Regions:
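Short secondary-structure boundary/capping segments
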Residues: 2, 26, 194-195
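N-terminal-biased segments
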Residues: 43-55, 166-177, 218, 222, ...
Length: 229
């Protein structure tokens, strides 16, 4: 429901052939406009959230996969730069009522920033509705599976490196904050972290269980990462 309310376009679907026959900008429509919707379904445009749409064309072709960069801490990665507005996958979305999408990166601990695009555009600049609207963080898991290639039991077990992985993420926050306070010529990673540390940017935290959610929220809301003093 929330996604539909945000959409700025209205779709009209013909019940007889189940196809979208009309797209109209709901912001510019006058309240006295009369639309003959007989035998039609009317609903707002849908937004695809947290998707690699336009970043991946064919999974098996490495050259067409741009949603996952090498490295662990990559806040400077901007998924919008790699967005392909002419992707065949993008073209298939509008006829099905999906008019906007949140293009998000994958991989690493800090994957990078996502942007919101509208799906009727010639290039990524034309498509962009909102630049770099949030940073995506994959929280470490307190559990892990055995590595079969090392002849380990494949069952679920406690991740003995969980504390050090969390500490690494916390240290990265603190280092970025320190660079902001003392170094005017910050490196690219610290610049990308500035909006998070100042509380100006949305953080999307990926977590699988209660402990990860609590630990992630405690890190981000603790005085250390966001203290502006």
């Amino acid at each position: 429901i929330a996604n539909c309310l945000v959409g700025s376009e209205m779709c009209i679907r013909d019940r007889s052939d189940d196809k979208l026959n009309s797209f109209q900008d709901s912001k510019n429509e006058k309240y006295d406009t009369i639309i003959d919707a007989t035998n039609h379904h009317i609903y707002p445009g849908i937004i695809a959230l947290n998707t690699n749409l336009g970043l991946v064309e064919i999974d098996a072709v490495k050259a067409s996969v741009d949603d996952d960069e090498s490295g662990s801490y990559l806040p400077e990665i901007r998924s919008i730069i790699a967005y392909n507005a002419e992707s065949k996958a993008v073209e298939s979305m509008r006829p099905n009522g999906v008019l906007l999408a949140q293009i998000a990166p994958n991989g690493g601990v800090i994957s990078g920033s996502s942007s919101v695009v509208q799906l009727d555009a010639w290039n990524w600049e034309d498509a962009t509705v909102k630049y770099d609207q949030g940073i995506h963080i994959n929280w470490p898991s307190p559990y892990t599976y055995g590595r079969w290639w090392l002849d380990e039991d494949r069952g679920l077990k406690v991740n003995n490196n969980y504390s050090s992985q969390v500490k690494g993420l916390k240290d990265f926050f603190e280092k970025s904050k320190a660079n902001m306070n003392v170094n005017k010529s910050m490196n690219i990673k610290s610049k990308a972290m500035k909006s998070i540390i100042n509380g100006e940017s949305t953080v999307y935290l990926y977590a699988d269980d209660e402990k990860e959610i609590v630990d992630g929220c405690l890190l981000y809301t603790s005085p250390s990462p966001r203290d502006s003093s």
